[in-house]
């Protein structure tokens, strides 16, 4: 007799790997004529901006640029000045060979080292390296057995649930607006911003993201070395074309400013501000699929091979804010803090004190003017440990897809001590992988030995916790017959307490 096997496909968890790579940096930056010449270098920062990611069998290609920003003290009392350069890069990474049907790549990292020196007052040499931490997460279409029939087959079904990665989109968008200064700025030291998506609407194949970008501008007036701050809110409303997106998806969208351009207005006209945002959208579609977890035949011997299927589910989503504080002594008790910045290392997960935390190493850099009127750079390292707020086992396989940003940063000098107060915003999702054992293949063998017709019932002493299906399989009888013969409630799957069971029509 032929056994009928029915199959379907589900998006199983695929390869999950993390690798490190180094982006070398070697450049010369020329100070423009409209900027003061260099008196003293204060600090150099490097930030990667990844514009393209291409995943191929055994290869991952990253394209983007390194944003190199140099802060210096200008000559003749010019105060704090800034210049920057964008250095394009293409990085090809070797990966293990694996099959995938959906994927996402998370690129993080931190500066490994930077050496910055003044060649002459209008030429700066920068050498160093940025360490990338690249995480690749995939799903792969996997066939599973969903039902069996004929051949006297009995089956135990299990429902597998998880999420299918429906969409991964990273898109650069432009946001424009105006900023009005009380007096024309002699120099704009820094443009930075925080963006948040306040409303996200899903349509079939489209997403509408509405939010606000808060831009902060540090600038200096003509003849005044004191830094001033100006901020402006720019609203954005972006319609994104997203293949595979539908209204039943679980979705998140994170906005990150990656560049700014300021065009000075003529006369009394306000200056024109153009910001470039990277919108990162992730979407998952929930699914459920019944699979055959175990099977046997009441008429034939069976030979089966187990199959382990890993599914992915959304353990939780993150939209949390946490405040970090820290302090440390300054070499000059009379230092005056002028500006401060925060950079984040890779976001990791750690199990501590019966709870999972999202962790990251945060470096806060503060610029200060010492008692000799020279500018110095001070650093304070903070440790982020954000509780996920959900009970998960200590051995859970979790994958973070998270982004961290500084919502608010304040640094002050009090009695010779640098005091830091940082508000961190964490956005993203935590995926959880779970292993499930199913029947991968099954075939009928030789017919079973006919039951002894003189034996109509057998007695089996079952122990607490034994599964009814396993007992029925041992004697090659239908679980439904076991239920009926022992007056067990319909739906009973396991024995609660030790008891004697009648086994009807048992074979030899």
List the predicted regions and their residue ranges:
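Primarily a LysM-type cell-wall glycan-binding module
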Residues: 446-484, 489-508
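Membrane-lipid interaction segments
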Residues: 2-454
């Amino acid at each position: 007799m032929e056994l009928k096997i029915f199959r379907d496909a589900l998006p199983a968890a695929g390869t999950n790997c993390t690798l490190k790579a180094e982006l070398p940096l070697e450049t010369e930056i020329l100070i423009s004529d409209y900027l003061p010449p260099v008196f003293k270098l204060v600090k150099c920062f490097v930030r990667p901006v990844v514009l393209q990611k291409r995943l191929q069998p055994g290869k991952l290609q990253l394209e983007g640029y390194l944003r190199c920003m140099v802060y210096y003290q200008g000559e003749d009392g010019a105060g704090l000045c800034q210049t920057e350069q964008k250095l394009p890069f293409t990085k090809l990474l070797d990966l293990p060979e694996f099959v995938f049907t959906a994927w996402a790549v998370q690129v993080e990292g931190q500066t490994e080292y930077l050496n910055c020196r003044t060649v002459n007052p209008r030429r700066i040499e920068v050498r160093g390296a940025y360490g990338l931490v690249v995480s690749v997460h995939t799903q792969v279409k996997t066939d599973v057995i969903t039902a069996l029939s004929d051949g006297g087959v009995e089956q135990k079904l299990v429902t597998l649930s998880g999420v299918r990665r429906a969409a991964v989109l990273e898109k650069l968008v432009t946001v424009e607006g105006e900023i009005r200064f009380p007096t024309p700025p002699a120099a704009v030291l820094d443009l930075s911003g925080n963006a948040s998506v306040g409303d996200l609407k899903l349509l079939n194949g489209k997403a509408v993201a509405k939010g606000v970008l808060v831009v902060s501008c540090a600038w200096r007036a003509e003849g005044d070395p004191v830094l001033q701050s100006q901020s402006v809110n720019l609203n954005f409303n972006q319609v994104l074309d997203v293949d595979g997106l539908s209204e039943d998806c679980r979705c998140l969208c994170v906005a990150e400013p990656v560049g700014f351009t300021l065009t000075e207005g003529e006369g009394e006209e306000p200056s024109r501000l153009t910001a470039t945002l990277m919108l990162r959208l992730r979407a998952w579609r929930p699914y459920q699929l019944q699979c055959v977890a175990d099977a046997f035949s009441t008429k034939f011997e069976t030979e089966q091979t187990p199959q382990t299927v890993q599914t992915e589910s959304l353990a939780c989503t993150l939209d949390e804010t946490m405040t970090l504080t820290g302090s440390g002594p300054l070499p000059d008790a009379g230092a005056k803090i002028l500006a401060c910045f925060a950079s984040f290392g890779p976001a990791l997960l750690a199990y501590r004190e019966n709870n999972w935390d999202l962790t990251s190493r945060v470096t806060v850099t503060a610029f200060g003017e010492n008692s000799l009127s020279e500018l110095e750079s001070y650093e304070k390292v903070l440790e982020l440990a954000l509780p996920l707020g959900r009970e998960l086992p200590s051995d859970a396989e979790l994958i973070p897809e998270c982004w961290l940003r500084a919502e608010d940063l304040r640094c002050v000098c009090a009695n010779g001590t640098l005091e830091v107060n940082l508000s961190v915003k964490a956005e993203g999702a935590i995926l959880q992988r779970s292993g499930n054992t199913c029947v991968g293949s099954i075939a009928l063998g030789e017919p079973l030995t006919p039951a002894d017709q003189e034996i109509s019932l057998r007695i089996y002493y079952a122990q607490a916790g034994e599964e009814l299906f396993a007992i029925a399989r041992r004697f090659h009888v239908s679980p439904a017959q076991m239920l009926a013969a022992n007056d067990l409630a319909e739906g009973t799957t396991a024995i609660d307490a030790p008891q004697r069971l009648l086994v009807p029509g048992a074979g030899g």
